[in-house]
């Protein structure tokens, strides 16, 4: 996929694969230490790399730059175009870089796993799968599940929604430490649900209070790596599923958690239907002011990424967001320090203090959820 480019034929996008592609690693050597001179230099390189305009017809759709300091510290900045990669792909890229680094240190050159398939095999499989009876049954599931869903579900806005959606955004983050993570995992185990289901339940409780609506539709990304061998491939496999929940005051937290468990399992079982096919089948009327079906996203990632290589340690640093595809995106990552929770939001719709207050209530529900699991939603303060 890193040798893949895109062009148009008869007005339609077509991918092609080059036998060889040129790649140059950008390099900056700094006479100083990272904690002093380094931060601005790294920030400047990040801004340069993140705003790089890819030519889709000139692979690789990857840009990288290494900043090295005289004391041996450094920063590797990588930008992968979204057409060729997803979060799982980034995990694979880091994993393979680790393997290659350690192999150079050890002198073992044959370390990368042999791939049993390529991305083109997946696209051929997907095109064939969409002609099957099984696919049609899965599509019918989604048509039934989302029939009559709200045309737009979102957090009430501070500013008027523009006639044409723009993607300007900002973000706000909180940390939940390991003690909180352990407590939530224990609670999930006792209730026989996943940590994701617990987090999503808390998020929907807060949304139901803020919106005063009882039909809540949230999008969540799924890895969608059901094709054999896709777990080892860099490429765009990610899909989105819509988790719809009926929420009413008489329900208990336990009731909602069980409903979300059932709906989530069904969504996972039907995750390989491309979201755009669902939108198309529902005949959703397009609106330039908002996205179809989903304007609130909830994402949970727990991919295991080690932070040690032979001879040194590293950490992954993500630049602050300045865009937002959705009105609201809650992105939670589990790591060795706990849960990193980021709320990415449309800055043209919401004030920062609105988002901070919303996230504060979300954190409060997470803190209390084991104690209030049998309480009716109407009684939650």
Predicted regions and their residues:
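Structured interaction and signal-relay segments at domain junctions
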Residues: 17-24
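Adenylate-forming
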Residues: 5-10, 14, 28-33, 40, ...
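A Lys/Arg-rich helix-loop hairpin that forms a DNA/phosphate-binding surface
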Residues: 373-381
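Receiver (REC) domain switch/active-site region of two-component response regulators
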Residues: 89
């Amino acid at each position: 996929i890193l040798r893949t480019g895109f062009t148009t034929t008869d007005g339609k996008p077509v991918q092609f694969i080059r036998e060889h592609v040129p790649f140059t690693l950008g390099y900056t050597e700094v006479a100083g230490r990272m904690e002093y001179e380094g931060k601005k230099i790294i920030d400047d390189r990040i801004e340069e790399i993140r705003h790089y305009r890819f030519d889709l017809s000139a692979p690789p759709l990857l840009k990288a730059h290494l900043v090295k300091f005289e004391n041996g510290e450094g920063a590797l900045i990588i930008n992968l175009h979204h057409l060729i990669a997803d979060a799982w792909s980034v995990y694979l890229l880091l994993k393979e870089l680790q393997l290659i680094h350690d192999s150079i240190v050890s002198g073992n050159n044959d370390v990368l796993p042999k791939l049993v398939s390529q991305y083109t095999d997946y696209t051929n499989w997907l095109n064939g799968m969409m002609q099957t009876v099984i696919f049609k049954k899965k599509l019918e599931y989604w048509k039934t599940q989302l029939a009559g869903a709200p045309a737009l579900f979102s957090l009430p806005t501070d500013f008027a929604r523009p006639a044409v959606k723009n993607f300007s955004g900002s973000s706000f983050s909180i940390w939940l430490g390991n003690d909180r993570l352990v407590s939530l995992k224990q609670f999930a185990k006792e209730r026989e649900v996943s940590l994701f289901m617990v987090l999503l339940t808390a998020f929907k409780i807060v949304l139901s209070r803020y919106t005063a609506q009882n039909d809540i539709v949230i999008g969540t990304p799924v890895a969608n790596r059901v094709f054999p061998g896709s777990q080892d491939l860099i490429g765009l496999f990610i899909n989105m599923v819509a988790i719809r929940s009926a929420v009413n005051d008489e329900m208990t937290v336990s009731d909602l958690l069980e409903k979300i468990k059932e709906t989530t399992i069904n969504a996972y079982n039907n995750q390989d239907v491309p979201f755009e096919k669902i939108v198309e089948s529902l005949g959703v009327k397009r609106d330039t002011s908002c996205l179809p079906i989903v304007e609130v996203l909830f994402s949970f990632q727990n991919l295991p990424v080690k932070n040690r290589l032979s001879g040194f340690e590293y950490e992954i640093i993500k630049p602050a967001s300045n865009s937002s595809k959705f009105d609201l995106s809650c992105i939670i990552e589990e790591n060795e320090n706990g849960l990193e929770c980021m709320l990415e939001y449309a800055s043209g719709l919401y004030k920062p203090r609105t988002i901070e207050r919303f996230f504060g209530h979300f954190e409060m529900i997470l803190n209390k959820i084991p104690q209030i699991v049998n309480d009716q939603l109407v009684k939650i303060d």
